[in-house]
């Protein structure tokens, strides 16, 4: 074991601390955007479930003899856009094709132009500062150091 990070997680020659920090912060921002995108997808899935459940509820209300309320549910809720002109799938499409695509593209540009295509250099350097180098389990530099160990049973 050479106990070193892999080359794709090391700082390219001549890259400043400030640049590593800036790209690390940009990566953190993209992480938040990815989380927001996940919540948007969760919203989309919940709205789909809500639509199906609302359809069932409308029929049950109708079957229970409450035609006026069932008609109002049919007219004013079932199939209605949660936002003007859009169902949740359209919100996802707009987000993915708009802001998300631009943010992801700009992040990739920063990684390519400023870090020579190397991702997570800021985090890799943080790991190197914090981990021990005494062979302690759980402090290996790379997964290969674990999977190459004869005692590894994964």
Question: Which ranges hold each PLM region?
Answer:
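C-terminal-biased regions
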Residues: 1-62, 67-154
């Amino acid at each position: 074991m050479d106990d070193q990070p892999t080359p794709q997680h090391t700082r390219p020659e001549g890259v400043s601390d400030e640049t590593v920090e800036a790209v690390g912060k940009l990566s953190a921002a993209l992480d938040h955007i990815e989380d927001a995108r996940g919540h948007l997808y969760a919203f989309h899935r919940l709205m789909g479930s809500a639509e199906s459940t609302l359809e069932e509820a409308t029929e049950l209300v109708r079957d229970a003899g409450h035609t006026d309320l069932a008609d109002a549910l049919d007219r004013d809720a079932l199939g209605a856009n949660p936002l003007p002109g859009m169902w949740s799938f359209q919100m996802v499409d707009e987000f993915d094709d708009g802001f998300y695509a631009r943010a992801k593209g700009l992040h990739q540009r920063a990684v390519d132009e400023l870090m020579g295509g190397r991702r997570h250099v800021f985090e890799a350097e943080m790991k190197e500062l914090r981990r021990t180098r005494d062979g302690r389990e759980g402090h290996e530099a790379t997964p290969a150091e674990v999977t190459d160990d004869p005692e590894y049973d994964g």
